[in-house]
Regions:
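Alpha-helical segments in soluble extracytoplasmic regions
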Residues: 24-28
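Amphipathic, coiled-coil-like alpha-helical segments
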Residues: 1-21, 41-93
């Protein structure tokens, strides 16, 4: 699959790391703002398949359920890593 420059930038975004840090530290307001930013950017670049995961993270943040938020974030990070690996493989061909 060919990714646009904007999609690659989204996948490389430091917001994923910031979200994990905010959740780990129990900084719920920061986590909420970060997931909102990630969700908006995903929609903007046409990566709707993250939407369900982001909704789950947002709901977990609203309940201040760090364990659930971390579990869903792990799924998102795995999906993101797979895509970045595919992009890297395509680039190195």
């Amino acid at each position: 699959m060919n990714y646009t420059k904007e999609q690659i930038e989204f996948l490389k975004s430091l917001d994923f790391m910031k979200l994990g840090q905010a959740i780990n530290r129990g900084q719920w307001q920061s986590a909420a703002m970060t997931i909102r930013r990630l969700d908006m950017k995903a929609k903007e670049v046409g990566m709707q398949d993250f939407e369900r995961n982001f909704t789950g993270i947002r709901q977990s943040i609203n309940r201040k359920d760090g364990t659930e938020a971390k579990q869903i974030l792990a799924v998102v990070v795995n999906k993101r890593a797979k895509r970045l690996n595919l992009i890297s493989e395509e680039t190195n061909k």
